[in-house]
């Protein structure tokens, strides 16, 4: 049983299926991930496992991070993430999880930080329609009305306006696994995933 794994986005390409149709796919380098901590209901109030991914020099970690890993006799790891589980008997500290936990055709949810687009306007950020471009109009890409008048006399919270676009945690659900390469720890996913090549991703089975 796999709860979740961490990996990096390598890039996108395309492959052909048995019928000769082109499938756009994303190549992911996933795992191996090491279980660094197992939490249980009696001690921690809930069941979960913490996994680590990505070798790193010890000097790149803080002393609390090093102490946490050394307590379990685990080498320094760059990323740590916790996943909830139903029961803690299946997993042990030091156990290695890799892409063999998944199967071709399985649906997964992939979470990562989207590409940052900087400060963006309403047309780009919220898909607003622009104003007239001719006939004397000066309202081309302006937001237009942003509220009522004297009542309520303020801009209501949550109003769609210009601001930061992207650079936030995004989840793409129910992506299909096309191929698995266990020797190279490669997952081939149908479609696109968040972020640029090299972006850290969390891969969990779809509910």
Curated annotation (Swiss-Prot):
HAMAP family according to UniProt: Ribosomal_uL3_B (MF_01325_B)
GO biological process: translation
Lineage: Eukaryota, Sar, Stramenopiles, Ochrophyta, Bacillariophyta
Disulfide-linked positions: none
Family as reported in the entry's similarity comment: Belongs to the universal ribosomal protein uL3 family.
UniProt cross-references to Pfam families, sorted A to Z: Ribosomal_L3
Gene3D superfamilies tied to this protein: 3.30.160.810, Translation factors
Quaternary organization: Part of the 50S ribosomal subunit.
Nucleus as UniProt keyword: no
An annotated GO cellular component: cytosolic large ribosomal subunit
GO molecular function: rRNA binding; structural constituent of ribosome
InterPro entries given in the database record: Ribosomal_uL3, Ribosomal_uL3_bac/org-type, Ribosomal_uL3_CS, Transl_B-barrel_sf
The keyword Iron is assigned to this record: no
Subcellular location: Plastid, Chloroplast
Origin: domain of life: Eukaryota
Protein name in UniProt: Large ribosomal subunit protein uL3c
Source organism of the structure: Phaeodactylum tricornutum (strain CCAP 1055/1)
